[in-house]
Amino acid sequence: MGKRIGIVGGEEEAHCVHMKRVLEGRGAEVVVLDTNRFPARQDMTFRDDATLLGQDGLTDLHAVYVRTIFYSLPFFEADPTLGQQPGGETLFADWHVDYTAERERQSFLTSFVRALGLRGVKIVNPIESFDLHFLKLLQIAILRDAGIPVPRTCATNDPATLAAFADEVGKVVYKPVTGGASCQRLTDKDLVADRLERLRNAPAIFQEEVPGVNVRVYVVGDEVVSATIIHSDDLDYRGTETGFEPIELPPAVAEMVVRAKDLCGLAFTGADLRLRPDGEFVLLECNPSAMFLGMVQATGAPIDETLADYLLA
């Protein structure tokens, strides 16, 4: 049997299934840490000198591919009256129990995988790099301060500040600070008083709308594996793609994307960019857990094979 490779994610999730098949085709022994089954149906143990999946020690893993691990604050129902039923039953009476259990689960999984890294296992991507997907404003600041071209950005809960920003940059798009919803254009309907007051509930990220087309770039290690224009009639192309057009990045742009990946502490990324009509590229985000099967199927780009090479190297 060849090298042992771990996969963190749902055992039946498409990317986990696919990478398991690719790695086993290379002779690897693949161990799936099924995050969907833990803790109810998957035993994991952290000891002073060992990390165990069931009774199977994992410190001899050569590498781990982290496909999905929920690394954010657990959800809880803030307003218990929303759960009150006509008969008086409170649906969310035990929300604090669920909240605490999920918090414990996330803390355990995060420490479990990070400890494997401390014990010499190659982690792709390091759990700490997922911070910058959850902390999108910090990622933008890191990239901008390093000279990476990113959109002009304003995150605020102040309606007056938003109005001034919109006047300054013209066309504006917005999205949640932590992600989880599609990017949308700011319209006059968003700038009415009752709509703006919703910012008092939670801030949002507002950015200049960069004209041009969407480009997805996959990087593994220091290699740009593919760069593709994604055609869509919608601002947020996810799920609405109408075509894929592979392109060759200018060397300086390829170098810029690799540098951005490194700044974010990533070994593998799917980076989102905009290609402006004047030929300039603007980086939107580096994703630590990028989906790639659709791109492999649409363009034949060897993202999966290159990722397998990196895990086995």
Model regions: which residues?
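Conserved N-proximal alpha/beta basic substrate-recognition cap immediately N-terminal to
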Residues: 10-22, 33-149
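Protein kinase-like catalytic core scaffold
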Residues: 123, 172, 225, 269, ...
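Extreme N-terminal starter segment of soluble prokaryotic enzymes
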Residues: 2-6
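Loop-centered beta-sheet repeat module
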Residues: 129-183
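C-terminal active-site "lid" helix and adjoining low-complexity regulatory extension at the edge
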Residues: 262-266, 275-313
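Short hydrophobic segments within beta-strands
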Residues: 7-8, 220
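Phosphate-binding site of ATP-dependent enzymes
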Residues: 23, 167-261
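Short acidic-glycine loop/turn motifs at beta-strand connectors
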Residues: 27, 47-48, 219-223, 276-279
